[in-house]
């Protein structure tokens, strides 16, 4: 089970990384297009190369239409895509100043409670995201600029949220078992399986 959860976590992280890479490329293209569009509209370019400037504007050199909408949807997915690996490797930011002096047993209890709370929160988020997605489907809401159905972004995020919830519940079960059996199944702070 641990290997399956780790494989799911890694797959989601790779997918999230690919989506973020696409969004970076999209943003760069959009910024370059916006800059070039401004240049071709400038008095300088229209003065020295009016035909070329008009041609570049006419072929559509400019920002990517709906880039903000796509970045918004993609970032939401990417966040959910990275959560499973953070859960598996205890990679979330934490401050241990207040717990470093506590016993290992107390820290194990705190890890268990934290994982259970995190699992509950991830399940609630996934359920609420599904509810919101069904509302968007029913209302046929579309994005403003490129008019794609908003539920597509919700569905993409829901895919990531479900994966995060599955791994979150798994980690909660693992930490509960570890606490009561006084054993370590998945070491904290290192990638499982290494």
Where are the model-predicted features located?
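Alpha-helical transmembrane segments and membrane-interface helix-loop junctions
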Residues: 1-194
